[in-house]
Amino acid sequence: MAKNRHLFTSESVSDGHPDKIADQISDAILDAIISKDPDARVACETTVTTGLVLVAGEITTSVYVDIPKIVRDTIKEIGYTRAKYGFDAETCAVLTAIDEQSPDIAQGVDEALESRSGSEIDAAIEAIGAGDQGLMFGFATDETEELMPLPIFLAHGLARKLTELRKTKKLDYLRPDAKTQVTVEYDELNQPVRIDTIVVSTQHHPDITQEEIAKDLHTYLFPEVIDPSFLDEDTKYFINPTGRFVIGGPLGDAGLTGRKIIVDTYGGYARHGGGAFSGKDPTKVDRSGAYAARYVAKNIVAAGLAKKVEVQLAYAIGVARPVSISIDTYGTSDYSEQELIDGVNALFDLRPAGIIHMLDLRRPIYRQTAAFGHFGRSDLDLPWERTDKAEALKKLIVK
């Protein structure tokens, strides 16, 4: 590797990974509830293990949804439909342990501090306080069209294409569990120049050889996802490096909601506030705040105000307005942090109800985000991925 160059690695997982099964179940339940009761409060956690699904959490709603059916339908859609996989949609046990949201939390979310103290006149927006304290990060970079870091973008692309090859039966020996990882080499200007390493671990039928798997992935997977200009004779490939991946899914590892937060975001390329997304309604700023921060960051880069930017938002429970906003452009902007913050404050309403309204979050859009990442999804129409405020933001800041 040339002097002053460096490597960066990100990973993704398939929809059949145990933690992602849990995320998808939690978000499928959220979607089912919010489609009937947009104002429902949902904090739904899922655990999966061999032959068992446990759904727990706090849900406050006036509607009924058939949680066991949602669980089984989600597992079936993912592809766990045979008992010999060690996890089967029809035969697994489904246990539920659901309570209502704590009234101590609810009073701060139902009526924000600003509303309770009479300090704000914008009653409709100020009425909702943040569902918890916490910090969230949003990020964007111009190194891909989707304004995402290249390592996580390619890792997701490999995981998504691998799942497609399985579900369309193009490679009918594949089973649902899989992981991908991509190492990108950056030059001294921090621009991606080549792929150093690709790792794919995919569950498979016991009778297929590793040589056959490797040949098929080089034929049907890598050319469909990776720009060949990034590949060279020194690019390393590790395909099922243990030599066998037959036991997978919840039979191989227990899965939990919220345990793939780096996969869900930027692959470690940007910082993370620690809060998970799946199973949470949009009053939870862990989710809506992170979506808003990505929306802000993406519009800053799309406006040409920076080449790379990280936005931090922070909230106090029961308080509507963010307690802080931070913007770091890594020296890629001609404008000061305060100029950017002033423009963002003028154009983006970052109070919880403002975010919910701005991004139209009280609708069933979450299940589709629970695998292959919440950001940079050109295959989905996600409101926080739009750049519809870029021109207005540019006009506010560029004098």
UniProtKB/Swiss-Prot annotation:
Catalytic activity annotation: L-methionine + ATP + H2O = S-adenosyl-L-methionine + phosphate + diphosphate
Entry binding sites for Mg(2+): D19
Annotated metabolic or biological route of this protein: Amino-acid biosynthesis; S-adenosyl-L-methionine biosynthesis; S-adenosyl-L-methionine from L-methionine: step 1/1
CDD domains found in the cross-reference section: S-AdoMet_synt
Gene Ontology CC annotation, any one: cytoplasm
Annotated region (Flexible loop), positions in chain: 101-111
EC number: 2.5.1.6
Record-listed K(+) binding positions: E45
InterPro entries: ADOMET_SYNTHASE_CS, S-AdoMet_synt_C, S-AdoMet_synt_central, S-AdoMet_synt_N, S-AdoMet_synthetase, S-AdoMet_synthetase_sfam
Cytoplasm is among the record's keywords: yes
Function per UniProt: Catalyzes the formation of S-adenosylmethionine (AdoMet) from methionine and ATP. The overall synthetic reaction is composed of two sequential steps, AdoMet formation and the subsequent tripolyphosphate hydrolysis which occurs prior to release of AdoMet from the enzyme.
Name of the molecule in the record: S-adenosylmethionine synthase
Upper lineage: Bacteria, Bacillati, Bacillota, Bacilli, Bacillales
Gene field: metK
